[in-house]
Amino acid sequence: RAQDDPQYRLEIGAGVGVMTYEGDFNGNVLGDMQPAGFLVGRYNFDPYKDLKLSVGFGKIKGSSANVDTFYPDYAENPYSFNHTLVDMNLVFEYNFWPYGTGRDYRGAQRLVPYILGGLGATYVKGNEKNVFTANVPLGIGAKYKVNERLNLGLAWTFHFSLSDELDGVKDPYWVKSSGIFKNTDCYSTIAVSVTYSFSAKCKTCNKEE
């Protein structure tokens, strides 16, 4: 039979979660979690694929006292930081199964896992200097279709930055490095989001051929 619910091209919403720095002064991927907020927009190509634009705002922190590595400069006076981070990311998301209510696209599932990857920009406001750099976001997530227009999302994303100074310190080992991601700082985000779907596609395009 014909599908009853329309598919939607666009989503807009917001989310909350945590942000964690991973670098020279924190070796634990889940250590020193800080609160974060997000704005989210999506363009849905079809029930499998979409493009997401997100803006995140949060904090990153770390300390040389919390790692086992010996840093000559901080042997007597440990270094610590607490910086503000803002980023913008454009990522491609691929759902493992078609996403929808099941009444908009034949075979669609309300709950689907997905993978994501893309490009982003990161700005960090430090105590002594600010850093602006690119990042490469890679992650996994899941979406749940509450109803025709309301969506819940959960995503865990790793952001591989091109800078070693998100923490305010460059080369604390006194060892020069080379390569695009060699000894650079990273951060991760875990976000729960709510989005609203709008801009319906033509219903007749959603029928099974």
Could you say what each language-model-derived stretch is?
Residues A14-V18, L39-Y43, L90-Y94, G117-A121, ...:
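Residues on the lipid-exposed face of transmembrane beta-strands in outer-membrane beta-barrel proteins
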